[in-house]
Protein backbone atom coordinates (compact mmCIF):
# COMPACT_ATOMS: atom_id res chain seq x y z
CA UNK A 1 0.00 0.00 0.00
CA UNK A 2 1.42 3.37 -1.02
CA UNK A 3 0.70 6.76 0.52
CA UNK A 4 -0.31 7.91 -2.98
CA UNK A 5 -3.38 5.64 -2.87
CA UNK A 6 -1.92 2.66 -4.72
CA UNK A 7 -2.81 -0.80 -3.44
CA UNK A 8 -1.14 -3.70 -5.20
CA UNK A 9 -1.36 -7.43 -4.43
CA UNK A 10 1.34 -9.77 -5.65
CA UNK A 11 1.70 -13.51 -5.21
CA UNK A 12 5.13 -15.01 -4.77
CA UNK A 13 6.48 -17.46 -7.32
CA UNK A 14 7.04 -21.13 -6.46
CA UNK A 15 10.59 -20.33 -5.33
CA UNK A 16 9.28 -17.66 -2.94
CA UNK A 17 10.48 -14.66 -4.96
CA UNK A 18 8.29 -11.71 -5.84
CA UNK A 19 8.64 -8.55 -7.90
CA UNK A 20 6.76 -5.24 -7.69
CA UNK A 21 7.11 -2.00 -9.60
CA UNK A 22 6.96 0.99 -7.27
CA UNK A 23 6.01 4.59 -8.00
CA UNK A 24 8.50 7.38 -7.38
CA UNK A 25 8.21 9.73 -4.38
CA UNK A 26 5.98 7.32 -2.46
CA UNK A 27 6.11 5.69 0.97
CA UNK A 28 5.00 2.06 1.03
CA UNK A 29 3.93 -0.48 3.63
CA UNK A 30 4.37 -4.05 2.42
CA UNK A 31 2.52 -6.90 4.14
CA UNK A 32 3.47 -10.55 3.59
CA UNK A 33 0.90 -13.19 4.51
CA UNK A 34 0.61 -16.95 4.21
CA UNK A 35 -1.89 -19.35 5.77
CA UNK A 36 -0.46 -20.89 8.94
CA UNK A 37 2.17 -18.16 9.39
CA UNK A 38 2.35 -14.83 11.18
CA UNK A 39 2.04 -11.76 8.97
CA UNK A 40 5.07 -9.53 8.57
CA UNK A 41 5.19 -5.83 7.60
CA UNK A 42 7.98 -3.83 6.01
CA UNK A 43 8.12 -0.11 5.23
CA UNK A 44 10.11 1.44 2.40
CA UNK A 45 10.25 4.73 0.54
CA UNK A 46 11.10 5.84 -2.99
CA UNK A 47 11.10 9.50 -1.95
CA UNK A 48 14.21 11.28 -3.18
CA UNK A 49 15.42 8.52 -5.51
CA UNK A 50 16.55 10.03 -8.82
CA UNK A 51 17.30 6.85 -10.77
CA UNK A 52 15.77 3.40 -11.02
CA UNK A 53 16.69 1.33 -8.02
CA UNK A 54 16.44 -2.38 -7.33
CA UNK A 55 15.30 -2.90 -3.75
CA UNK A 56 15.45 -6.42 -2.25
CA UNK A 57 13.74 -7.52 0.94
CA UNK A 58 13.22 -11.07 2.20
CA UNK A 59 10.24 -11.75 4.43
CA UNK A 60 10.79 -14.51 6.98
CA UNK A 61 7.40 -15.65 8.21
CA UNK A 62 7.20 -17.53 11.50
CA UNK A 63 4.84 -20.52 11.80
CA UNK A 64 1.87 -19.72 14.02
CA UNK A 65 2.18 -22.96 16.02
CA UNK A 66 5.93 -22.73 16.76
CA UNK A 67 7.15 -20.78 19.82
CA UNK A 68 8.97 -17.59 18.89
CA UNK A 69 11.77 -16.65 21.26
CA UNK A 70 11.81 -12.96 22.12
CA UNK A 71 15.55 -12.23 22.19
CA UNK A 72 15.39 -8.65 23.40
CA UNK A 73 13.28 -8.88 26.56
CA UNK A 74 15.36 -8.41 29.71
CA UNK A 75 14.57 -8.32 33.42
CA UNK A 76 16.50 -7.07 36.40
CA UNK A 77 18.43 -9.90 38.02
CA UNK A 78 16.19 -12.03 40.23
CA UNK A 79 13.23 -9.69 39.60
CA UNK A 80 10.33 -9.29 37.21
CA UNK A 81 11.02 -5.63 36.46
CA UNK A 82 11.56 -5.04 32.73
CA UNK A 83 14.76 -3.16 31.91
CA UNK A 84 14.83 -0.14 29.55
CA UNK A 85 16.76 -2.30 27.04
CA UNK A 86 13.58 -4.36 26.62
CA UNK A 87 11.59 -1.56 25.01
CA UNK A 88 12.58 -2.36 21.41
CA UNK A 89 11.80 -6.06 21.80
CA UNK A 90 8.50 -5.34 23.51
CA UNK A 91 7.51 -2.84 20.83
CA UNK A 92 8.32 -5.44 18.16
CA UNK A 93 5.91 -7.77 19.96
CA UNK A 94 3.24 -5.04 20.05
CA UNK A 95 3.75 -4.56 16.30
CA UNK A 96 3.56 -8.32 15.67
CA UNK A 97 0.24 -8.49 17.51
CA UNK A 98 -1.10 -5.43 15.70
CA UNK A 99 -0.07 -6.96 12.36
CA UNK A 100 -1.85 -10.22 13.29
CA UNK A 101 -5.09 -9.06 14.94
CA UNK A 102 -6.71 -12.51 14.96
CA UNK A 103 -4.08 -14.39 16.93
CA UNK A 104 -3.93 -15.02 20.64
CA UNK A 105 -0.65 -15.88 22.34
CA UNK A 106 0.67 -17.72 25.34
CA UNK A 107 3.48 -15.63 26.72
CA UNK A 108 5.87 -18.07 28.41
CA UNK A 109 8.66 -17.12 30.79
CA UNK A 110 11.40 -19.60 31.71
CA UNK A 111 14.20 -19.46 34.26
CA UNK A 112 17.54 -21.18 34.62
CA UNK A 113 18.22 -24.00 37.10
CA UNK A 114 19.88 -21.77 39.68
CA UNK A 115 17.95 -21.41 42.93
CA UNK A 116 14.84 -22.90 44.43
CA UNK A 117 12.28 -24.55 42.08
CA UNK A 118 9.29 -22.85 43.71
CA UNK A 119 10.97 -19.43 43.67
CA UNK A 120 11.89 -19.86 39.99
CA UNK A 121 8.30 -20.81 39.16
CA UNK A 122 6.96 -17.71 40.95
CA UNK A 123 9.56 -15.49 39.29
CA UNK A 124 8.70 -16.79 35.82
CA UNK A 125 4.95 -16.25 36.39
CA UNK A 126 5.59 -12.65 37.46
CA UNK A 127 7.90 -12.04 34.49
CA UNK A 128 5.30 -13.34 32.03
CA UNK A 129 2.70 -11.09 33.68
CA UNK A 130 5.04 -8.08 33.42
CA UNK A 131 5.26 -8.55 29.66
CA UNK A 132 1.48 -8.99 29.39
CA UNK A 133 0.96 -5.80 31.42
CA UNK A 134 3.26 -3.92 29.03
CA UNK A 135 1.33 -5.20 26.00
CA UNK A 136 -2.02 -4.24 27.54
CA UNK A 137 -0.69 -0.76 28.33
CA UNK A 138 0.14 -0.45 24.61
CA UNK A 139 -3.36 -1.27 23.40
CA UNK A 140 -3.35 -5.07 23.09
CA UNK A 141 -6.59 -6.70 24.30
CA UNK A 142 -5.97 -8.79 27.43
CA UNK A 143 -8.23 -11.53 26.00
CA UNK A 144 -5.50 -12.24 23.42
CA UNK A 145 -2.78 -12.81 26.04
CA UNK A 146 -2.16 -15.69 28.42
CA UNK A 147 0.84 -15.35 30.74
CA UNK A 148 2.44 -18.64 31.80
CA UNK A 149 5.47 -19.15 34.00
CA UNK A 150 7.27 -22.46 33.56
CA UNK A 151 10.17 -21.80 35.90
CA UNK A 152 12.80 -24.40 35.11
CA UNK A 153 10.29 -27.05 33.91
CA UNK A 154 11.03 -26.68 30.17
CA UNK A 155 14.76 -26.36 29.54
CA UNK A 156 15.96 -25.50 26.04
CA UNK A 157 16.55 -28.31 23.55
CA UNK A 158 19.56 -27.52 21.35
CA UNK A 159 18.60 -27.05 17.71
CA UNK A 160 20.89 -26.81 14.67
CA UNK A 161 21.27 -23.02 15.01
CA UNK A 162 22.33 -23.19 18.67
CA UNK A 163 24.66 -26.12 17.95
CA UNK A 164 26.45 -24.07 15.28
CA UNK A 165 26.73 -21.13 17.68
CA UNK A 166 27.89 -23.32 20.59
CA UNK A 167 29.60 -26.42 19.10
CA UNK A 168 30.09 -27.97 22.56
CA UNK A 169 26.30 -28.27 22.90
CA UNK A 170 25.14 -31.40 21.00
CA UNK A 171 22.12 -31.10 18.73
CA UNK A 172 18.91 -32.33 20.46
CA UNK A 173 20.57 -32.06 23.91
CA UNK A 174 18.20 -30.97 26.68
CA UNK A 175 19.84 -28.30 28.85
CA UNK A 176 18.85 -29.96 32.12
CA UNK A 177 20.76 -30.04 35.39
CA UNK A 178 22.30 -33.46 34.71
CA UNK A 179 23.94 -32.14 31.53
CA UNK A 180 24.79 -28.63 32.66
CA UNK A 181 26.67 -29.78 35.77
CA UNK A 182 29.11 -31.74 33.56
CA UNK A 183 30.33 -28.48 31.95
CA UNK A 184 32.87 -25.87 33.01
CA UNK A 185 31.59 -22.80 34.89
CA UNK A 186 31.64 -20.50 31.83
CA UNK A 187 29.78 -23.06 29.70
CA UNK A 188 27.27 -23.59 32.52
CA UNK A 189 26.53 -19.85 32.44
CA UNK A 190 25.91 -20.01 28.68
CA UNK A 191 23.41 -22.84 29.25
CA UNK A 192 21.73 -20.93 32.07
CA UNK A 193 21.42 -17.85 29.87
CA UNK A 194 19.82 -19.95 27.10
CA UNK A 195 17.30 -21.37 29.57
CA UNK A 196 16.37 -17.86 30.80
CA UNK A 197 13.99 -16.81 28.04
CA UNK A 198 10.61 -15.42 27.09
CA UNK A 199 8.61 -16.99 24.26
Residue ranges and their predicted role:
Residues 11-13, 21-25, 50, 63, ...:
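Surface-exposed coil/turn segments at beta-strand junctions on protein surfaces, enriched
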Residues 40-72:
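Extracellular beta-sheet/turn segments enriched in Thr/Pro/Gly and aliphatic residues
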Residues 16, 22-37:
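A short, solvent-exposed beta-strand micro-motif common in secreted/extracellular proteins
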Residues 75-109, 132, 136, 194-195, ...:
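Periplasmic peptidoglycan-binding/anchoring modules of Gram-negative envelope and division proteins
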Residues 110-199:
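Periplasmic OmpA-like peptidoglycan-binding domain that tethers envelope proteins to the cell wall
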Residues 3-17:
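Short, acidic Ser/Thr/Gly-rich low-complexity loop/linker segments typical of extracellular
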